C-alpha cells in the first residue's frame, strides 16, 4: 500500500514537472507575428524616416540577422535577432526624454512586434541609443523587410514611429 502511494506521488510530481517545463519552453520561444492589414496600414501611415525632436533630427539604423554560427550548445531554434539604433544625426547626445519601446518588423503581410531590451553593443557613442530583441521569428535570410520602432516622449507621452525600409535579414555563419 505504501509503495503504491509513493509510486502515485512520483507520477503526479513527474506530470507536474512535465507541464511546468513545457510551459516554460513555450514562453521562451513565443513570438508575436500577425497578419493585420489595418495595423500595417496604420504603421506605414504614421511612420517617418526622420524624427524631429527637441531641435534634433533622428533616424533609425537596424541590423537583422539569424545566427547559424556553430559552437556552444546545439540550438533547435535560430530566431531572428534585431539590433536597432536611434541615431541623432546632428551628433548630439540622444535626448533622455525619448524612450524606445517597441519594435515592428514587416515582412510582406506579416508583422513581428516585440518589446525591446537594452542593447549589448560596447562603446556605442552617446548620439546613438542601442536596443535589442533576440527572439524573433525564423524567417528566411537574404530578404528585405521594413523595420519600425515606437518611441515615446517621456515629457508629453506622445508616441512616434520611426522607419527604416528595405533592411536585409543576414545570416551569420
Task: Please describe what each predicted stretch is.
Residues 58-88, 95:
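Contiguous beta-strand segments within globular domains
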Residues 31-54:
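Post-signal peptide N-terminal segment of mature Sec-exported envelope proteins
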